Amino acid sequence: FITAAFGIPQISTGDMLRAAIKAGTPLGLEAKKIIDEGGLVRDDIIIGMVKERIAQDDCKNGFLFDGFPRTLAQAEAMVEAGVDLDAVVEIDVPDSVIVDRMSGRRVHLASGRTYHVTYNPPKVEGKDDVTGEDLIQRDDDKEETVKKRLAVYHEQTEVLVDFYSKLEGEHAPK
């Protein structure tokens, strides 16, 4: 809704990383290993990708970050680069709900169609509604991986709420 209303692109580091993984780039291969183990890709890689992306023409009138920044270093790098934010939104969801939602997700890789075993099940269990092909659970949606990612979130990302609430001056969210 926001991207359509303002005519701006959504910038998702997760989508950018998945595209690199699918393409089999060196960054993609490195990222896949880290993500599959429940870790976060190094800040320097993410920051570089984001800076490159927001320099593109379709971002000249703005953009919507999705899942970025995730660490204090990423947030500070954006401030240092002069990237001003109009607003920062935190969506607070209990860990148990996140684990349930992510670990129940199933994907048809060829099309990207996404299902959920409880909330959006396919017509035939484990099969894509359109093609009848198998659905898979991505490695990063497996319960133990989701729990590891949540632990990393609590350690590295929760501090951003405090960072943005205290940010002052020209770079503070308006």
Swiss-Prot record:
The record ties this protein, via CDD domains, to: ADK (cd01428)
Amino acids binding ATP: R105, T114, Y115
Q: Does the keyword DNA repair apply?
A: no
* A GO biological process held by the record: AMP salvage
Chain segments carrying region NMP: 12-41
**This protein is called what?**
Adenylate kinase
| Annotated region described as LID, given as residue ranges | 104-141
Q: What does this protein do?
A: Catalyzes the reversible transfer of the terminal phosphate group between ATP and AMP. Plays an important role in cellular energy homeostasis and in adenine nucleotide metabolism.
GO MF term list: adenylate kinase activity; ATP binding
Q: Identify the keywords attached in UniProt to this record, alphabetized.
A: ATP-binding, Cytoplasm, Kinase, Nucleotide biosynthesis, Nucleotide-binding, Transferase
Subunit info here reads: Monomer.
Query: Where do the TM regions start and end?
Result: none
